Amino acid sequence: MNEDKEQKINIHDILNTRPKLTKKTALDVFFEDLDDNVITPINEYVLDSGSSSSSSIYQALKCSNNNEFVAVLLQKFQNLHIHVLEQQRRLIESKSDLLPISLHDMKYVDELINLLIIHGIDANLSPTMKIPFDSKRINTFKKGQKSAEYETPRWHTINNDTLSQVITVFYNVLTSERSSDYLREIISKGSAYANILLGLIVLHLQLPNRYSSQMITNLEDTQETYTLFGVYTLLVETIQDEKVREPILSKLTTLTLRRPENGLISLIDFVLGVRDAEDIDIEKFNRIYQILMSKPKTMTNLQYLTELFKQIYDGLTFVNRPILVTCLNGLILKFYLRNKRIVNDFLFKKVRSIIFNSPLTDHTAKELNDVINVLISLSKNSSSDLLNDLVTSCPDEDGTTPGQFFLYVWIYALFLKKNQKLDPLEINKLSISDNKSTDSIHFPEQSSSKYYEVVLSLLKSLIVITENFQYLNVLSLNLLNFEHEKWKYLIDLDTQLPYISVKNTDMAELFFEKGSKNSQISEFLQDMDLSIELFMEFLVLLNDEEQSKTLFLDILKRWVHHTKKSEKRSSDNHSGMPSVTDNALILMDLKLLECMNNRFKTKIVNKPKDVLIVIDQLIDVVQEKDETIQEVEADSDDEVEEGEETEELDPNENSSYKIILQLLSTVLSESSSSILLQNSYILKSISRKLQSFNTNASEIDALLASIDNILINGHTTERNDNIEIEMDEERLDKAITSLHDPLVPIKSYGLTELRHLAEKKSPVISLEKVLQIHLDYLKNMDPFIYLNVIKGLTTLCELEPETILPLLAEFYANKKKKNRLDDVLKVGEVFINYIQRQNELFQGKLAYLIIDTCLSIVRPNDSKPLDNRWRMSSMSILGMCLQINARGVSDRIRDMLDCVFGILQLEQPQNHLKDKDDSFLMRRSAVHLIHDLLYSTGFDLLPFEYNYDKLKTLLSYVRDQDEDYMVCEQIDKLLTVLDSL
C-alpha cells in the first residue's frame, strides 16, 4: 500500500514538474544562425527562382559574385571549427561520451562543406580539371535531381585566389597538430578530402614551388594509405586534363613505396576489396602483379626492388592473413620467373642472414619471430623450385652447405623444446609482461600447438615440398647439436620469446667447466633422450613410410660401420677403450634404431626388398669385422684357450649382428611368401652368408630353415614389368596421405602430385577421380588451397578438354542446386583462365558449350531468379570469349547481344526491394561486354538488328536514365569509342 502511494506521489510530481530547458551552447546558437542566415535563404531562393538562367545562388546571401559568396561560407566554417573545438573541450572536461555535433546538426555541417566544395573548389577549376559531379557521391544528389544550389552561374570566371583561400582553410584544419579534432575527422573521412587534395595539386601546377609541394605531402600524411589509394584512383579515372592527371598518376604509382610501413598491404587490400568483403577474383591478383612488376619512372631498378622487397618481407610476417600471403607469394613467383637473382638477392639473402646469423650479430625476438613467419608464408608458395632455391642454394662464403638450412631450423626447434617452458602467446594475452614489444609480433594461429611444434611443421613443409628427404640423415647425425659455435639462442624471461645473441668467448671459457663430471654425463644423456624424442615426434609428423624406412636403413648401416670402426680401434688400442665420441654416436644411433623399430616396425618391413638388400650388405660388414677382431686377438694373446676364444668370437654376442638377425626375422615373419619370392636372389645370397658362419646358434638355424622353406615351396619369378605401376601407386598413396595432412602446404603438394599422375596418364587413378578430388578441395576456405585448385583445374582442362569441360560446365550450371555459389564462381575463374590460355584456339563445340552454359545463366528467370553475382560471372566469361577470339565464336554474338539489350532495357533499379539492389552489377557487365566486342572486332561482327544506330540509341537512353554513376561513366567512355570507330 505504501509502495502504491509512493508511486502515485512520484508520478504526480513528475507530471506537475515544469520542463527544464537545457541552456543552449555556443554551438547550438551557431547552428541556429547558420540555418537562419545561410541554409534557409539558399533553399528559399532555389524554390523562388526556379530554373531562371539569369538568377544566381549568390543572390541568396546578397553576394554579387563567387568570391563574396565563398567568403561568407568560409567565415561560417571557421566559426564552426572554433565552436566544435570548444564543445570538445567541455565534453572532455565533463568526461562525457556525447558527440560534439548531434546527428540532427550534422546535416548543416554536410551542407556547408558541400557548398564550399562546389562553389569554392569546383567553380574555380576548369571542367577538365575537376571531379565530375556524378562521381562526387554527395548524399543529397540523385540522378536527374541536381539542385540549383550546386550550380555555378555561366558568367562566373575562375578565380585562383578564391580557390587558394578555400584550400588554405581546409588545409589548416586537416593538418593541425591537435590530438582530437572532430571536424577534421569529418572532412578526412568524407568526399571533401579528394576535392581539397585535387585543388591543392592544381594550385601547385599553376605556380610550382617547394612550399606547395610540401603542403601536398603534409596533406597526404593526414590520410591513411588505403584511403589515399581510393582517392588517387578516383582522380585518375575522372580527371581529363593530362597535365593534372600526370602528377596524380605519379603519386598513385609511387604511393606503395612512399608508405613503407603499409603501402604494399594497403594496395593489396584496396585492389582485392578485402575490407569491403568482396569476392576474391584471380584477375585482381593479376592486376596487382601488373602494377608492381613495373617500376615507377622516377626510381632506379635497385631502389625500387630494395624498397618493394622490404615491404614484401614485412607482409609475409602476417601469417594469419592468408589472402595477403597468397598474393605476395604470387608476386614473388612472378619476379622469380623473370629473374631468379631478384628474389635471391632481395628476399632470400635476408632470410638466410638471420637463419645462419651471417654476418654475425645479435637479433631481437621480433626479428627471429619474423623470419620464421616469413618461412611459414613462403612454404605456401606454389613453386617447389623457388622453395628449393631458398633451402639449398646457400652462399659458399659463409661456409654453409645446402643441408644446413634444414639443420639450423632443426636446432632452433630443439632449442625451443628444451628451453621454452611457457607459451609466449598466452603470456602476451595475460599481459604478464610489461614489455610492449610483443604487440608488433605476429604469432601463427595454432594456439593448441606449442611453438616448437610450429617450427617442426615448417621443417616438414620445406622438406616435403622440395623433396629433400636426403637431409633427414643429416638431421639424424646432429641430434646432439643444441648450439652454434659463435652464437646462441636465448629466452627472454619476461616474454618467453627467443632471440639471438653472439657468444662472448671470454665468458664462455670462464664458465666452461661447470658441474661435476657425473652431472655433465647426466645432462648429456638427458639431452640425448630429449633430442631423440623430438626427432621421433618429427618423423611421426612427417608420416612417410618410405622415408622412415630409408632413414632407418641408413642409420642401421651407419651404426654397424661405426661399431666396426670402434671395435677395431679398441683392438688396436692397448687400453681397449673406444673414444668418447665413438661411444656417443653409437649409443645415439642405437637408441634411435630402437625407437624407430618400436614405432615403425610394420612400415619398415612393408616393402622388404630394400631391407633385404641392406641386410645382405651388412652381413658382409659384420663378418669382415669379426674376422679382423679374431686376427688381432690371436696375435695379441696366444695363450687364450680355444674354448674361451670361441666364446669371444660368437656372432650372437655381437650387438650389431643381433639387430641384423632380428630385422631379418621380422621381414621373414611379417612379409608374405609371394612378395619375398620376388627377391629370391637376395634371400639366396643371405642364406649362403649365414651358412658360412661357424656357429651352432639356434636363431640362425631357424632363419635358414625359413628361407629354405620359402625358396623350395614358391616360384621364383620377378615382376620387373610392373615397377613403374608400383612407383605410381606409391606416389598415389603419398598424394592421398598429403591431402589429409593438417598443414596447408602439404595438402597443396598432394594436389600437385595427383596432377602429375594425371599428366602422365597413369592407370592407377582416373582423370575423373582427379577432377572430383579437385572439386572437393575447391570448397576449402583457405585461399592458398582453392587458388591452387583453380590453377590445377585449368591444367586438367588443357590436358583432356573433351572429358573435363563438360563436367565443369555441369558443375557451373548447377541445375540441381547442389553446389555453393562461391564454388560455382570459382569454376567461372577456371573457364576464364582456360579461355586465356587457349587464345585463338578457343572455338568449336567446347567453346560453344561454355558460352551456352553462360547464356542460360545470364537470361533472366522470373520464376527462379539467380544471384546477380553468378550472372555477372557468366557475363565476364562471355566478355573474355569476345576479347580472346570473337571471330571464333561469331555464331553466338547475336545471342550475347540479345542478353545485353534485355539487361539494359528491362533490368532497371529496384529501389522497392527490401534487400540491397544489385541490379547495377548486370548493367555494368552488359556495358563491358559491348566494349569487349567493339574493342576486339569493331563493327564487323555486329548483327543487323543490333547495328551502330540502335546501339548508340540504347546507350544514350540508359546514360540519361540510369542512377548508377559507374554505369553512366562507362557508357560515356563507350560512346566515345563508338564515335571514334
UniProtKB/Swiss-Prot annotation:
Q: Which InterPro entries match?
A: ARM-type_fold, Rtp1_C1, Rtp1_C2, TANGO6/Rtp1
One of this protein's GO BP terms?
A: protein secretion
Stored Pfam families: RTP1_C1, RTP1_C2
Q: Which domain of life is it from?
A: Eukaryota
Q: Where mainly found? A: cytoplasm
Where is the protein situated, by its record's location annotation?
Cytoplasm
Q: Name one GO cellular component term.
A: cytoplasm
Which residue ranges have biased composition labelled Acidic residues? 630-651
Q: Which UniProt keywords apply?
A: Cytoplasm, Repeat
Ranges where the record places region Disordered: 630-652
Question: Where do the HEAT repeats lie?
Answer: 64-101, 161-199, 226-261, 366-403, 609-646, 655-692, 765-799, 800-836, 945-980
Q: How does the record describe its quaternary structure? A: Interacts with RNA polymerase II subunits RPB2 and RPB3. Interacts with the R2TP complex. Interacts with the nuclear pore complex subunits NUP100 and NUP116.
State the protein's purpose: Required for the cytoplasmic assembly and the nuclear import of RNA polymerase II. May facilitate the starting interaction between RNA polymerase II subunits RPB2 and RPB3 and the subsequent interaction of the resulting complex with subunit RPB1. May also participate in the transport of RNA polymerase II through the nuclear pore complex.
Q: What protein family is recorded?
A: Belongs to the Tango6 family.
- In Swiss-Prot or TrEMBL terms, this protein is called RNA polymerase II assembly factor RTP1
